[in-house]
């Protein structure tokens, strides 16, 4: 898909990937915002979208999305990793719509749709294994945030979730049996192998902490230090993008402060108050962060590699969404306590200023991470390889140049058991070029070498 789009537009593949990444992050933001606002809406908070916590949530989420590594969901494998989280967010919002949070009979097609959705979630990716408990937590959070928690088991959303779980298990159980059988013979995708040891608790805690912004900033600072690149605080004043961002922050501050007086009395006068929705949203955020962290903590691959705190992994993007929900719950508490109009305005201004600063740090950390990539030989070679695929030279000299690039890439990543190694990338590029151009990316006959075999591949992330 990326190659076809790059060929059609004449853009380099990494530029197309950048556009795709922005689209996916936008969809993630919409889904996360929908999750947060649905919980508060159940409590009668922010139904008009004017509550400061609702207004500030985009800034909260933006501040948490620290890339944290070259192979994080934000920088690599976007469609699979971010797409899996988007799918789970969409599933939760579909299972527990406003009209499903009451007692009613299900239409004939609803069980069928939920069974199908559950099967899709089980067959998509390892990360979506947490979908049933995640959706259940969302249903409970919505019910607990309102005044209908006692009627939870009678709600249509609970029955819809039951069908979703049944469809999920119908695919999940036989799939995991087959995976376990293959892993017992050392012929499975390594990251799918589960191992229950005492190390699970430590790895889960590390993965949970990694989703917090300070951990991402700290890890990125270490990468920059090793690459000899300054974090660049002095560049903030000269960064046009950040100036525009700060102007937007100032605008949001004004809106939040103006809305504080009109919205906060709604919270204090509502029979539910602010404590229950804040607790429900905080609990949902904790579950959202803990489930993927535990899933990856159980992975034998994670226990072997032992990624550092702050080093983004496949689950990090969902953990970050969980942290954003917990931070928003804290904002609901702050604005619930600050009931006087003057105090509410000050609280809104301070919250926006703090979020603006953290968002600027996250943006700067992510921007500096791209500079680390640019100074590494691997990034330069990868860019040249992608450009050579788009602007394909079918001559013998073109083949020689592409083969030299493959050799240089393989010298950096020689292990054929890794997915992104030189031999495996060579095979994939050959397959792509044969389908598009009719000739391989690097002809081993003309190059004077033999194409390596493609052994079992380990997980790259």
Spans of features found by a protein language model:
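Hydrophobic cores of alpha-helical transmembrane segments in multi-pass inner/ER membrane proteins
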Residues: 85-94, 131-135, 167-170, 244-252, ...
């Amino acid at each position: 898909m990326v190659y076809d789009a790059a060929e059609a537009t004449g853009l380099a593949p990494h530029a197309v990937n950048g556009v795709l990444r922005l689209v996916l992050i936008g969809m993630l933001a919409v889904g996360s915002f929908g999750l947060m606002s649905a919980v508060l809406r159940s409590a009668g908070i922010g139904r008009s979208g004017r509550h400061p916590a609702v207004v500030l949530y985009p800034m909260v989420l933006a501040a948490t999305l620290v890339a944290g590594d070259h192979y994080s969901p934000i920088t690599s494998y976007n469609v699979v990793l971010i797409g899996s989280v988007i799918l789970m967010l969409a599933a939760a919002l579909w299972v527990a719509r406003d009209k499903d949070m009451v007692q009613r009979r299900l239409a004939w097609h609803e069980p069928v749709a939920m069974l199908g959705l559950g099967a899709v979630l089980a067959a998509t990716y390892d990360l979506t294994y947490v979908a049933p408990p995640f959706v259940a937590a969302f249903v409970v959070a919505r019910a607990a945030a309102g005044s209908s928690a006692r009627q939870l088991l009678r709600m249509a959303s609970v029955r819809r979730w039951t069908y979703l779980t049944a469809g999920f298990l119908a695919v999940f159980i036989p799939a995991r049996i087959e995976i376990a059988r293959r892993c017992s013979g050392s012929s499975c995708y390594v990251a799918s192998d589960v191992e229950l040891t005492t190390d699970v608790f430590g790895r889960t805690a590390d993965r949970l902490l990694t989703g917090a912004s300070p951990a991402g900033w700290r890890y990125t600072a270490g990468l920059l230090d090793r690459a000899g690149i300054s974090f660049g605080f002095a560049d903030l004043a000269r960064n046009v993008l950040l100036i525009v961002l700060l102007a937007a922050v100032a605008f949001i501050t004004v809106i939040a402060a103006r809305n504080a007086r009109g919205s906060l009395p709604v919270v204090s006068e509502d029979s539910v108050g602010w404590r229950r929705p804040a607790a429900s949203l905080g609990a949902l955020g904790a579950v959202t962060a803990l489930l993927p962290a535990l899933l990856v903590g159980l992975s034998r691959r994670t226990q072997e590699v032992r990624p550092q705190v702050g080093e983004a992994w496949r689950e990090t993007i969902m953990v970050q969404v969980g942290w954003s929900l917990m931070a928003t719950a804290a904002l609901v508490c702050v604005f619930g306590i600050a009931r006087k109009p003057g105090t509410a305005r000050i609280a809104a201004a301070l919250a926006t200023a703090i979020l603006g600063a953290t968002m600027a740090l996250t943006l700067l950390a992510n921007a500096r991470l791209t500079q680390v990539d640019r100074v590494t030989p691997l990034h330069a070679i990868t860019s040249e390889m992608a450009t050579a695929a788009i602007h394909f030279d079918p001559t013998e000299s073109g083949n020689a140049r592409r083969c030299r690039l493959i050799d240089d890439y393989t010298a950096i990543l020689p292990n054929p058991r890794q997915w992104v190694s030189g031999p495996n990338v060579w095979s994939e590029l050959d397959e792509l070029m044969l389908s598009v151009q009719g000739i391989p990316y690097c002809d081993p006959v003309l190059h004077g070498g033999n194409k390596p075999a493609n052994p079992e591949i380990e997980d790259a992330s």
